[in-house]
């Protein structure tokens, strides 16, 4: 079995008399894509922010890469990458300028073009060399130039390109763990699937990925294991396939059967409500 990279034990978060997270416990293992699913207000984003050291917990124990959250929050920040929302970027700066800005915050140096090529926002070294070939067909040259967004300003990007860029910034410090909070919200179906492939590539390169999502198909496609949260509690934790099999074995049948069941059926069966994307 792979090593635990995150361990959460009896985590509680109170806001006055309201308990947003109610004593949840779970582990995340090296190299997996782990999903936190739940309706709005379930506690998934709060849980993520606590692990990211962005929000204080009320009680409970958390370790990240063997480090105690209470004792080594600064060291934990060095091994994680956190996706910012679009409001966290200067819209008038070029992508290369933004990458260099984040390098300064992390006190590290990377080649902006190499970083952007990881998320398909600029040309690879091979394509940049092809662009200099005097014999390159004009149509092919234009196609390559259109692909290169390194010199574009952030505000000029499409929604999918902005999401890919935000993921690029999480990779600058070569983190062991990447946190993605609703990474495909608002994207069209093709842009969502492109981002899924990027997330899988990042995992395949050795990172562990923690994701929150409203989309059942996304969790089913991406996640090795998921925890379903409802009203601050974990009500199920397993692989998507195992959850679906357990539901079918309980005698569940769809009213209109296309497939026997999917992950969305599991969620509605457990929580009694459909997911809301507000």
Language model features with spans:
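Conserved catalytic motifs of ABC-family nucleotide-binding domains
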Residues: 174
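Conserved ABC ATPase signature
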Residues: 130-135, 153-157
